[in-house]
From Swiss-Prot:
S-adenosyl-L-methionine binds at G83, M88, V134, E135, R149. Transmembrane segments: none annotated. InterPro entries: rRNA_ssu_MeTfrase_G (IPR003682), SAM-dependent_MTases_sf (IPR029063). Its EC number is 2.1.1.170. The keyword Cytoplasm applies. GO terms for cellular component: cytosol. GO terms for molecular function: rRNA (guanine-N7-)-methyltransferase activity. The lineage of its organism: Bacteria, Pseudomonadati, Pseudomonadota, Gammaproteobacteria, Pseudomonadales. Belongs to the methyltransferase superfamily. RNA methyltransferase RsmG family. It comes from Pseudomonas putida (strain ATCC 47054 / DSM 6125 / CFBP 8728 / NCIMB 11950 / KT2440). It is found in: Cytoplasm. This is Ribosomal RNA small subunit methyltransferase G. Keywords: Cytoplasm, Methyltransferase, rRNA processing, S-adenosyl-L-methionine, Transferase. Pfam families: GidB (PF02527). Specifically methylates the N7 position of guanine in position 527 of 16S rRNA.
Length: 216
């Protein structure tokens, strides 16, 4: 274990994952802690996250990402994390689902360099890192799932990514407060399939997940 990661961090991750109903293998637990160590190390120079205290990163980043894993269904193999930043939730998604293809996209070169380092050090062969604005990204095929965490408004999220999916794609938007005002501006061809209030161990404040589909 890296000197940047403490036994308390390891225990908080194990306990929090169990509370979320996520059973981590020893390898997944080790890789998540390895990711945490890289995040702590690189954040000092690269400003990857506004969370500066390593003791807050387990709950506010790792467990927050794990809180949506029960909504990542087995029949969806090709996922995109838009505006991934420091890699949440894309890196935990790739660690927990090694047989799914996960693409993490960000327009910030420093952040994609960090994500490339994570891919290399943790040997995440199922992870693809893309340095691009989301509007300019042109994948070879639609994604099965598109997820974002604190990326933009619901209107922008759907408009900027509509070309990356089709009517079979699920869009997952991770939010803090329920974005009722943002849903008013949701494009007419998108519909809300499900709204979930989430409880994240160690996190204060509200968490919500909205699952959307495109009608046409």
């Amino acid at each position: 274990m890296s000197s940047l990661v403490t036994p308390q961090h390891a225990e908080e991750l194990s306990t929090g994952a169990r509370q979320l109903g996520v059973e981590l293998t020893a390898e997944q637990h080790e890789k998540l802690l390895g990711y945490l160590a890289l995040l702590i190390k690189w954040n000092k120079a690269y400003n990857l996250t506004a969370v500066r205290d390593p003791d807050e990163m387990v709950s506010r980043h790792l467990l927050d990402s794990l809180s949506v894993m029960s909504f990542i269904h087995n029949d969806r193999d090709n996922w995109l994390d838009v505006g991934s930043g420091g890699g949440m939730p894309g890196i935990p998604l790739a660690i927990l689902h090694p047989h799914k293809r996960v693409t993490v996209l960000d327009a910030n070169g420093k952040k994609t360099r960090f994500l490339t380092q994570v891919k290399m050090e943790l040997k995440l062969d199922n992870l693809t890192v893309i340095h691009s604005r989301v509007e300019a990204f042109q994948p070879a095929q639609p994604f099965d799932g598109i997820i974002s965490r604190a990326f933009s408004s619901m209107e922008n999220f759907t408009n900027w990514t509509r070309h990356l999916g089709d009517t079979g794609t699920q869009w997952l938007a991770m939010k803090g407060l329920h974005p009722a005002d943002e849903l008013v501006a949701l494009p007419a061809d998108f519909t809300v399939e499900s709204e979930q209030a989430l409880t994240v161990p160690g996190c204060q404040g509200q968490r919500h997940l909205l699952i959307l589909r495109r009608k046409a």
